[in-house]
């Protein structure tokens, strides 16, 4: 018994003294700053439910200005959190190739079949071929325009519901309507039919939400392999396997239905296009399982990003009546006495585009980017990020977008006017504004996401005036983290009334 106690005490002493001993020796110069760490868990105890906020606070605490990089230590993996646009430039442009890989995680391995999609696959020939396939045949500008009718029909469907509700003077759960609309548009484009609650398939939305939550979860085994058993005990492995099985079976049924239908169709969706490419592929061997993963990725990126963004857009506009009035006046200039604002007119609306940019500045689709992995030493500014251990780099777009040195003293406030004279776009060329990333890993479906958001917001603001009865929360109040996305903890409940100039 004494021997067991002695061994246990020695083990605990090692855990707590080992970090102290390491602090007295330096194996690499110019390491990024790191807050005080506990053994095993690093400084995970200092993180809140919203890690992007915690990392920004820790960075500001350690440096007099914005910390270019912050180091965490849940060993044997190390993470770097970049909160500076200058260092983000070095990561995503100067050293883009060195940071082009993705780390392998348990969620990616189980749900994404080891990362054989575009977003999570390792950089190499397979990734290049998959990205080329998607950008050329699925996500090109011409393809985006070809689905204009789908967007118009689903937006019009929401308008009809809002008109009916406005006559009753009752509030509407706008978040619920926007979620259904986003799901319906993405599903019709991807697989040719709806899977909304109205189709008695609400489980589809629940399964998508589970995938997003699991992809953004924290499996202990990813960082501390010796403690991987904890993930099994808390049921994380089982949840990942179950949701993976559900989507494999669902998407396989969808693909088989398209195969059985053949080419005798009036309209083609993404599955049809991919099946055609499956037969044409020569040098690049596209497999049926790859089709399932591409469609799953489009569901995840398209549905969640689109819904989160348009929900934030409507929330911010409703909370800022002066911005809503300016937006209505601009839209009325282009679309006076029309029942629907078409996409060709939306292209010319500068204030609308400024509103969308401001939404993405304050609430980027992923506050922390999908992590990048490094395999060799890189010098970023005055810091050396070493190879040898597993290095994972996160770009904190949320923090960069709120840097007062770039965006001024009112960086936390919703001010679309700031974008009217700034030549910013979503392509990641200005590293102070990177809502969709930059470089080789730039999000490929920007046009699909932004088009639905722009035309949807334009029509909902053009056709209706909006008000909320309860005291509006602050723009960042009531948040919840759902995997890699940050959305409202509470739905947007608002009162629509027909705008006078549309009657």
Swiss-Prot record:
It is an enzyme of class 1 (oxidoreductase). Its cofactor is heme. Its main location: membrane. It is a single-pass membrane protein. Its EC number is 1.14.-.-. Heme binds at residue 443. Keywords: Heme, Iron, Membrane, Metal-binding, Monooxygenase, Oxidoreductase, Transmembrane, Transmembrane helix. It is found in: Membrane. The chain crosses the membrane at residues 1-21. One of its GO terms (cellular component) is membrane. One of its GO terms (molecular function) is monooxygenase activity. CDD domains: CYP71-like (cd11072). It comes from the Eukaryota. Belongs to the cytochrome P450 family. This is Putative cytochrome P450 71A28. It comes from Arabidopsis thaliana. The lineage of its organism: Eukaryota, Viridiplantae, Streptophyta, Embryophyta, Tracheophyta. The gene is CYP71A28.
């Amino acid at each position: 018994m004494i021997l067991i106690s002695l061994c246990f005490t020695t083990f605990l002493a090692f855990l707590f003294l080992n970090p102290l001993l390491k602090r007295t020796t330096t194996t690499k110069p110019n390491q990024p700053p790191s807050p005080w760490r506990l053994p095993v868990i690093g400084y995970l105890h200092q993180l809140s439910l919203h890690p992007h906020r915690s990392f920004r606070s820790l960075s500001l605490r350690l440096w007099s200005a914005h910390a270019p990089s912050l180091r965490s230590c849940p060993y044997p993996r190390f993470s770097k959190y970049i909160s500076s646009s200058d260092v983000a430039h070095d990561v995503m442009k100067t050293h883009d190739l060195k940071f082009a890989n993705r780390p392998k995680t348990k969620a990616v391995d189980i749900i994404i079949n080891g990362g054989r999609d575009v977003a999570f696959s390792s950089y190499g020939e397979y990734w290049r071929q998959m990205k080329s396939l998607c950008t050329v045949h699925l996500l090109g500008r011409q393809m985006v325009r070809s689905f204009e009718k789908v967007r118009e029909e689903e937006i019009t469907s929401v308008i009809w519901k809002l008109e009916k509700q406005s006559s009753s003077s009752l509030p509407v759960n706008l978040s619920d309507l926007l979620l259904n609309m986003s799901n319906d548009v993405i599903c019709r484009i991807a697989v040719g039919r709806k899977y909304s609650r109205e189709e008695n398939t609400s489980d589809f939305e629940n399964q998508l939400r589970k995938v997003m939550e699991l992809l953004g979860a924290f499996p202990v085994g990813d960082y501390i392999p010796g403690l991987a058993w904890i993930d099994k005990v808390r049921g994380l492995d089982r949840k990942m396997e179950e949701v993976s099985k559900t989507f494999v079976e669902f998407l396989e049924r969808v693909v088989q239905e398209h195969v059985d239908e053949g080419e005798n169709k009036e309209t083609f969706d993404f599955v049809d296009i991919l099946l055609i490419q499956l037969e044409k592929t020569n040098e690049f061997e596209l497999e049926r399982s790859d089709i399932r993963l591409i469609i799953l990725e489009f569901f995840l990126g398209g549905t969640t990003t689109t819904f989160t963004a348009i929900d934030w857009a409507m929330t911010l506009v409703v909370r800022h009546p002066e911005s809503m009035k300016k937006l209505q006046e601009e839209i009325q200039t282009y679309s006076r006495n029309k029942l629907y604002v078409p996409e060709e007119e939306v292209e010319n609306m500068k204030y609308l585009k400024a509103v969308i940019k401001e939404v993405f500045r304050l609430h980027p689709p992923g506050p922390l980017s999908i992590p990048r992995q490094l395999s060799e030493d890189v010098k970023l500014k005055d810091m050396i990020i070493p190879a040898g251990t597993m290095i994972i780099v996160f770009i904190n777009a949320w923090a960069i977008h709120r840097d007062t040195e770039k965006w001024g003293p009112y960086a936390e406030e919703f001010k679309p006017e700031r974008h009217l004279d700034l030549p910013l776009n979503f392509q990641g060329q200005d590293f102070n504004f990177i809502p969709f990333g930059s470089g080789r890993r730039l999000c490929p479906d920007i046009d699909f996401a932004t088009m639905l958001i722009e035309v949807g917001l334009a029509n909902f603001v053009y056709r209706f005036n909006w008000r909320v009865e309860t005291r509006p929360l602050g723009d960042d109040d009531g948040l919840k983290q759902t995997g890699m996305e940050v959305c409202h903890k509470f739905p947007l409940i608002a009162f629509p009334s027909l705008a006078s100039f549309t009657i």
